[in-house]
Amino acid sequence: MSAGPLQAAPKKNYGALIGAGPAVGGAAFNRTLSEVASYERSRRDHATPDYRIKIVVVGDGATGKTSLLMSYTQGQFPEDYVPTIFENYVTNIEGPRGKVIELALWDTAGQEEYSRLRPLSYGDVDIVMVCYAADNRTSLTNAEELWFPEVRHFCPHAPMMLVGLKSDLYSLDALDRLVDPTDAELVARKMGAFVHLQCSAKTRQCLEDVFNTAIHTALYDELRAPPQRGVKGMFKKKQQRDPQAQSYKRVRKHRCVVL
């Protein structure tokens, strides 16, 4: 696989990978917390990583998307809400077999007035996180009725996950006003999301699981067990000598549409 951004592969059985157990929050990746940096600046100033993964985070405004990314990349939870237009966060990860992964996280604006600018974020995306807030049932409805159609329009083949934010609120008593996780699971199935996870940026509960799952999915082929020796292994090696067999690794196929 080349050092370029990974291609979304819709035909892979992501469900099998996630359902196997270790993938969801599976083998943790060693991260280097970085300062906020633009994706392009990171590519220019730092040594070329072995892999680049781009994750775009979408959802209603004030659901906690920015807090999610800041908590993961910087270990900080912002106390004050500041509406986001566009922000990029970059963190380096030690991936499988000691490979270095550059994880580019794109934060988008959920407000309607930015709907014409938001599609610019979808280019070359590897994973899309559609987010809702545990204390906002409307945000879950919009995940299915607003964000899912938008993502599928601009990125018809990008793997998509449904992520519930502010999960720490479930520890309080006012459960009647929170999103029922069963309803969220149903929405995830309707959307065709490969997984539904909940996390808290404030307490960091399951935060690493969310991103580890996204990374495992983007690196699906790399994380699969190597072929066994024997006839099957010899056939596999023969396939790898064929340039066409390595088109996934060498050629960047742009599958997202930006109008």
Curated annotation (Swiss-Prot):
Superkingdom classification of source: Eukaryota
A Pfam family matched in the record: Ras
GO cellular component, one term: incipient cellular bud site
Protein known as: GTP-binding protein RHO4
Classification via NCBIfam families: small_GTP
GO molecular function: GTP binding; GTPase activity; protein kinase binding
The family this protein is said to belong to: Belongs to the small GTPase superfamily. Rho family.
Positions where lipid (S-geranylgeranyl cysteine) attaches: C256
Residues engaged in binding GTP: 59-66, 107-111, 165-168
Membrane-related topology note: Lipid-anchor
Source lineage: Eukaryota, Fungi, Dikarya, Ascomycota, Saccharomycotina
Keywords: Cell membrane, GTP-binding, Lipoprotein, Membrane, Methylation, Nucleotide-binding, Prenylation
Motif Effector region: where in chain: 81-89
